[in-house]
């Protein structure tokens, strides 16, 4: 921003002079705030559009390239595997092989359990860890994320689906609606990425996500009490009161002690394995393979003891073979189309939030960048293709991704290795899971969701921002006391409410001068800062829009009234100048201009002059276009608060 100089006379009025005029002795040198060069409407629109949707300049690699090179770069942007695949070597493969085998041992038992969480046959969990990871490996940009079904999305999807169709009485329609929801989840994710609308998921605050995930984890754990205790008749509701009532009411006749012995023993084993892995990072493989070891041992135990004859519930038959096509099962018309769309949008957004958060976390650890919009397209494509190959909503799994990271994965090939292992399982090993007890699946899921209850993050949220803590607790209690969808609705609602509150009620502060400097700061933050006699300086910490313009005007007037009462009580010089520090005011609209005009008229009646300090380019431009700068006088707009104070109070050095 350029600036011009003009001196101030002894009466505090600013008299313009030419830049070439010599400055008089002891005359403060002040700077005029310049209006930025005017742009035509099209250029201004294109600049705003680019900064909003293309701030990362995704087309920069295409500049000054031949048509053939641009075509290749375009293909690589959609399929990053083409770029990194050229540099792939045996050394990278070793790391990916170990990581892929490790996460495969973790995903197989988890997939069976998560499918049951969504009220689907266990084979659909395995299907969902075969096709989607292959698609993501070709299109995704994260090296560390491990793809497959996850607990929270499985619970959410199952809850929403059961609200429409009973899976016990109408399993075929239920399955069709699941595939339809998965299709629209993928379409939603891909559309957000393609149209670069990924910022929409940022409206769900971190605090709300922490609360929602924690509540969902407890809900999932409570749902596993059916398999953990061997209860046959169990509530279909997910709230904590209904679940605990169902558990207690079946205590005398519904619990199976053999089931409890199996589930409790292996849960302790899994927790000890996790503890060992946390204490010694080199032993990360122990908690990774513990679930598969538990499945093998418990299955063998049930088989040789025939515990299933004594009330221990088992998985029973699992079909062999690859994913069958499910394209014809998707609803593209009829009553269930809109229901599938609604469920797909909700589950797709939650899955997207989790995957992007996981991808960014591990990318930061390895110091590389992922493109959020490309990730959304990749996740969307894999779910669209997955819906056509008998898969349900898949996303990035935090537990598997953490194991993948610690196992030393180098590229997305670890997902391909995992898919191959799942493929071999589907072709040859599924009959071996016939005697796998449901109790061990319950123990595995409980062990997997425990880390989702992040107590340390909740405590930190409480310390940092109490309103964030309210959002966190609102989502948490909404999930565990009502339902998953209500908890999600509360999380989104409170997140939006916080945004609206911050937009409509921006902070304002009175500024004072730091002794020995020309710096003006918040007097509450710096108690040593001194007020200037006859001058009130207020900073507005937000853009001034229609949503907050009246509040800003009223808040400034209230500051002024309080200051005048204090000055009158202390018999100090009355307020003659009101300086508004506008550095944080990034923009202003028509309502904001009208609010300043109303403030100016009100100050005139009280014989107080309005002065502005350091308005930014968009603001100063609009002040000139609206002629507000002409109204208050160009000599009342300054580059800094210090210059404004010096100009308004030329005898300041004698008084302070």
Curated annotation (Swiss-Prot):
Chain segments carrying region Disordered: 1-30
Cytoplasmic compartment segments: 1-94, 141-144, 278-283, 364-375, 434-441, 495-656
Molecular function as annotated in GO: secondary active sulfate transmembrane transporter activity; symporter activity
STAS domain mapped to chain residues: 525-648
Chain ranges on the Extracellular side, renumbered to this chain: 116-119, 166-176, 219-256, 305-342, 397-412, 463-473
Induction: In roots and leaves by sulfate starvation.
Membrane-related topology note: Multi-pass membrane protein
Keywords, in A-Z order: Membrane, Sulfate transport, Symport, Transmembrane, Transmembrane helix, Transport
Main location per the UniProt record: membrane
Tissue note: Expressed in the phloem of cotyledons, hypocotyls and roots.
Record-linked PROSITE patterns: SLC26A, STAS
Family, per entry: Belongs to the SLC26A/SulP transporter (TC 2.A.53) family.
Additional facts recorded: Loss-of-function mutation of the gene result in an attenuation of the source-to-sink transport of sulfate.
Function: High-affinity H(+)/sulfate cotransporter that mediates the loading of sulfate into the sieve tube. Plays a central role in the regulation of sulfate assimilation.
Name under which the protein is recorded: Sulfate transporter 1.3
Source organism per UniProt: Arabidopsis thaliana
């Amino acid at each position: 921003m350029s600036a011009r100089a003009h001196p101030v006379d002894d009466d505090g009025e600013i008299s313009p002079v030419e830049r070439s005029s010599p400055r008089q002795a002891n005359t403060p040198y002040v700077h005029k705030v310049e209006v930025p060069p005017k742009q035509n409407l099209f250029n201004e629109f294109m600049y705003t559009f680019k900064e909003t949707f293309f701030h990362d300049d995704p087309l920069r690699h295409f500049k000054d390239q031949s048509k053939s090179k641009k075509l290749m770069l375009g293909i690589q942007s959609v399929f990053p595997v083409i770029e990194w695949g050229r540099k792939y070597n045996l050394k990278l493969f070793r790391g990916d092989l170990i990581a892929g085998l490790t996460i495969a041992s973790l995903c197989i038992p988890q997939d069976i359990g998560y499918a049951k969480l969504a009220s689907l046959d266990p084979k659909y969990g395995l299907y969902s860890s075969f096709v989607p990871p292959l698609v993501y490996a070709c299109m995704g940009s994260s090296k560390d994320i491990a793809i497959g079904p996850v607990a929270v999305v499985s619970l959410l999807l199952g809850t929403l689906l059961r609200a429409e169709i009973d899976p016990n009485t109408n399993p075929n329609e239920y399955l069709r609606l699941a595939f339809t929801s998965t299709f629209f989840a993928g379409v939603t994710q891909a559309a957000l990425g393609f149209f670069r609308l990924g910022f929409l998921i940022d409206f769900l605050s971190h605090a709300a996500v922490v609360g929602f995930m924690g509540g969902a984890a407890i809900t999932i754990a409570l749902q596993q009490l059916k398999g953990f205790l061997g209860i046959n008749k169990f509530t279909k509701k997910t709230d904590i009161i209904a679940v605990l009532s169902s558990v207690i009411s079946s205590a005398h006749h519904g619990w199976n002690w053999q089931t409890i012995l199996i589930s409790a023993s292996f849960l302790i084993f899994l927790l000890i394995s996790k503890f060992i892995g946390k204490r010694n990072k080199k032993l990360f493989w122990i908690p990774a393979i513990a679930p598969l070891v538990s499945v093998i041992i418990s299955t063998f135990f049930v088989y040789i003891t025939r515990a299933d004859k004594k009330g221990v519930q088992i998985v029973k038959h699992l079909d062999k073979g690859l994913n069958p096509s499910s394209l014809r099962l998707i609803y593209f018309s009829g009553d269930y189309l809109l229901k599938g769309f609604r469920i797909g949008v909700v589950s797709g957004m939650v899955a997207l939030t989790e995957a992007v958060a996981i991808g960014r976390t591990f990318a930061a650890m390895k110091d590389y960048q992922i493109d959020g919009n490309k990730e959304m397209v990749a996740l969307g494509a894999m779910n669209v293709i997955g819906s056509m190959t008998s898969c349900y909503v898949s996303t990035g799994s935090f537990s598997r991704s953490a194991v993948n990271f610690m196992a030393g994965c180098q590229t997305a090939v670890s997902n391909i290795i995992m898919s191959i292992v799942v493929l071999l399982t589907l072709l040859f090993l599924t009959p071996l899971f016939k005697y796998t007890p449901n109790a061990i699946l319950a123990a595995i899921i409980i062990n997997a969701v425990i880390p989702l209850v992040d107590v340390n993050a909740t405590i930190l949220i409480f310390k940092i921002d109490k309103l964030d803590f309210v959002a966190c607790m609102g989502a948490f209690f909404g999930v565990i006391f009502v339902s998953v969808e209500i908890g999600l609705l509360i999380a989104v609602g409170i997140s939006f409410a916080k945004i609206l509150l911050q937009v409509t009620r921006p902070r304002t502060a009175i500024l004072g001068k730091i002794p020995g400097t020309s710096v003006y700061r918040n007097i509450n933050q710096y108690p040593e800062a001194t007020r200037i006699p006859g001058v009130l300086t207020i900073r507005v910490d937000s853009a001034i829009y229609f949503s907050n313009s009246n509040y800003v005007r009223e808040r400034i007037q209230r500051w002024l009234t309080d200051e005048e009462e204090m000055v009158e009580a202390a018999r100090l010089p009355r307020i003659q100048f009101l300086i508004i520090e506008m550095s944080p005011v990034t923009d202003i609209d028509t309502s904001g201009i009208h609010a300043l005009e109303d403030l100016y008229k009100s100050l005139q009646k009280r014989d107080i002059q309005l002065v502005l300090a350091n308005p930014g380019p968009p603001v100063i431009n609009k002040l000139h276009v609206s002629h507000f700068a002409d109204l208050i006088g160009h000599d009342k707009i300054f580059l800094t608060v210090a210059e404004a104070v010096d100009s308004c109070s030329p005898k300041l050095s004698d008084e302070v």
